UniProtKB/Swiss-Prot annotation:
NCBIfam families: dnlj, PRK07956.1. Its EC number is 6.5.1.2. NAD(+) binds at residues 47-51, 96-97, 129, 152, 189, 306, 330. GO terms for cellular component: cytosol. Its cofactor is Mg(2+); Mn(2+). GO terms for molecular function: DNA ligase (NAD+) activity; metal ion binding. This is DNA ligase. The keyword Manganese applies. It catalyses: NAD(+) + (deoxyribonucleotide)n-3'-hydroxyl + 5'-phospho-(deoxyribonucleotide)m = (deoxyribonucleotide)n+m + AMP + beta-nicotinamide D-nucleotide. The active site is at 131 (n6-amp-lysine intermediate). It comes from Rhodopseudomonas palustris (strain BisA53).
Amino acid sequence: MKSKSKTVPDVATLTKAKAKVELMRLALEIERHDKAYYQEDAPKVSDADYDALRRRLEEIEHKFPELVSGASPSQKVGAAPARGFAKVQHAVPMLSLGNAFSDDEVAEFLQRVRRFLNLGDEIPAIVAEPKIDGLSLSLRYEQGELVRAATRGDGSVGEDVTANVRTLKDIPHTLKGNRIPAACELRGEVYMLKSDFLALNKKQEEAGEAPFANPRNSAAGSLRQKDVAITASRPLKFFAYAWGEFSGETPERTQHDMLGWLDHAGFVVNPEITLCHSVDDALVFYRRIGEERAALPYDIDGVVYKVDRLDWQARLGFAGRAPRWAIAHKFAAEQATTILEKIEIQVGRTGALTPVARLAPVTVGGVVVQNATLHNEDYIKGVGNDGQPLREGRDIRVGDTVIIQRAGDVIPQVVDVVLDKRPADAVPYEFPQACPVCGSHAVREDGEVVRRCTGALICPAQAVERLKHFVSRLAFDIDGLGEKQIELFHERGWVKEPVDIFTLKTRNATLKLEELEGYGETSVRNLFAAIDARRTIELHRLIFALGIRHVGEGNAKLLARHYGTIDAFLGAMRAAAAGQTEEGNTSEAYQDLDNIGGIGDIVAEAVVEFFAEERNVEALDALLGELDEVLPAAQVKRDSAVAGKTVVFTGSLSKFTRDEAKAAAERLGAKVAGSVSKKTDFVVAGEDAGSKLTKARELGVSVLSEDEWLALIQG
């Protein structure tokens, strides 16, 4: 199958319909990265790449303001609080900042401020402060006493880390001075000194534990510990620089003077903060602090500019997720050159082949870097995700002198090649066409930049996740065999492929499951009974359980209904796989598959790729040898009373489970939806029905009880 790079269209060329789809894609990607950064303290992309995603989203929303929704990343901050900590509602939201990446954008920011305030030629004073790369924190004081500390979370709701925060020496338990409000939220950044970070990582390595990636991650991970003693043992620091709720009037009238008040109240305020009276002053500060960045004892990733007068801040207010009176001027990423010694391919849990650069050790921004991401095969060739040349088309080869960048001090990446230092014997890198772990052929779908292993059922790199999928609720759903059991059995080498689940009983004389902690003869007997009960399985569940890319529950049901039986399905798939060529697939079996309503090219190609890998077929044949029966698909009744109708089930159903209700409705030709809209025909409401029932009544959608639904479908 021929592959091509996914083209990202210019915003100016987007239609409204395409813009809506692109906004959805960007929102999902940004949400995933927000969760990694704010909840997991493990960012997956550089600041520069993340900022690029947000800028594209904001450009599209600027062109199509009618597409902006309350759920857009431009309207919210961070990620929802992680499980495990109590939730805290911020009295005043902890918003994020807009970004500037050039001197011109800083000048434009000040121009906007002047226009909004109608200042004419007057230049507003600006407070410039280093942007600390740490974890934002809000501290609530009542009658001067610290009563609660919370992380930013999603900006509205954070995590309660009060007990941990009380161990930080930089945070006063009682405010000092005589102008203390009845209640206030004081804010700042938890961080770790570079020297303390290096010492902590040395201890981690000596203890055989994984080192932290950077000071920001170590600070966030140290603060968000369940064991307060661990937090207390970590050298965490805190700079105060802002406030949220403040009962009564603030004791000062400017940002700069309020920082002085915070200092007198007992907080540490960054001594580098400077009051600027022009754009030039602000940019001089930016360049000076940038030059001193490496020598600073803590990590920073830019400079924050804030309008000094608080009454002007109040007038300027907010625009979406960010204040109009402040902006972050980001630094360019730190870089260094070194030798690319090797390119290795890592295979992820979903089969994605990711190239990793193994480098001669080099210090970038104070951190020794030996590995860096190469993203994908197009990136190595010098082609961007939009199909346009990268690095003026320069490819990356083993032996090259390469430029390494730590953008935002997160994941190092190879950003360019020094061509005049390229060895004479360096050859273009050939990306593997087979999985380096299992040997299955690796394919790249049209429009994608990632090449994936097709050995879904047999690849060790994917095994655990595939097996978890195999036993999931919509697949084989084996009672007593969940994710933890799969991890345990796989770790011990007992279950490597799906068929191994069904041979556990015959192998148990050797395995002795009953001797495992938490198991006994009764629990093992029950597990084997549950496995035996699944030796008879519905065709759509089996298809879903195979873990074929793009084949979710809905597509599995479409395939099952079309082919009817396992024999017909397998025969068609083998015929379609046999007709596959580099130029495409013109076999009758493939055309039949491609023409199934709701399937289409992408799904059809993914299914054929799965069956083109002979070892997948062998693994499936072995599994079928252990099953008693694969039940034929129930045929949909096109003439039922609910055929073609959209139905939503809500509340607690007493006469059938939600899955049974859904299956019955689909057999009768109905579409089961998860939410109520104007297109919904029926809402079947059980006990304790909530918001869906309310919305149905508001929209005038027909609401049925269980008995009324049964009467309708039984006709």
